[in-house]
Amino acid sequence: KRIFTIIMMAVAHMCAAIAVSAEVKASVVSPDGATVVNVMENEAKVYYQVDHNGKNFLNPSRLGLRTNAFDFTELEFVSMDKERAEGEYEMNRSKASRMSYDVTKAVLTFRNKEGKNLIVEFHVGGNDIAFRYFIPKEGETGSIRIFEELTEFCFNDSAEQFRPDRTGQGKHCTLNSC
C-alpha cells in the first residue's frame, strides 16, 4: 500500500507540473455550468482537465494514441465545434432502464506531424463526462490497430466518488479512502 501511495504522489506531482505550463486551447462547459473540461496543449502533447462545482476533479491527463497507420502522440489543436445535445435512451440490462441526458457535445480536431487528423468528441453533463476518439478514414484503410493508448485519468487527491452498497444506499468518499 505504501508503494502505491508513493507512485500516486509522483503521478500527482507530474500532473501538477503539466498544469503550470500548459496552454488552454478549448473549454467545454456542461449546460448547467457545473462541469468544465479544459483541453490544453504543452510541447505537442494534449491534456484534458476536469473541474466540477468549482473544484478540480481530474488533474491534467494525457490524450492520444499510436496506431499501425498513424502516430497521434504529438498533436496540434485545430478547431472545436460545440452544440447542446439532449435525448433519451433505454437499457435493457439495468436497474434504471430509461435514461435521459443533457450535455454539451464538443468535437475537437487535432493534427499530427504528418497532417493527419484525430477527432476527440466530448460529452459534458452536470455530473459526468465521456469522450471518444475518431480517426477519419483515408484511402483504402479498412481497419486500424491501436498499438498504444496514452489516455490518462489523473484524479485529484481530494476527488470524491459515490460508492453504492447492495441496498441502493451508499456514501461519498475520497478515492483514497473508499
What would you call each of these model-derived segments?
Residues K1-I3:
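Positively charged n-region of N-terminal signal peptides that target proteins for export
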Residues I6-A16:
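Bacterial N-terminal signal peptides
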Residues A17-A22, A26:
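Boundary at the C-terminal end of the N-terminal hydrophobic targeting segment
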Residues K25-C178:
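N-terminal accessory beta-strand-rich subdomains and adjacent acidic, glycine-rich linkers
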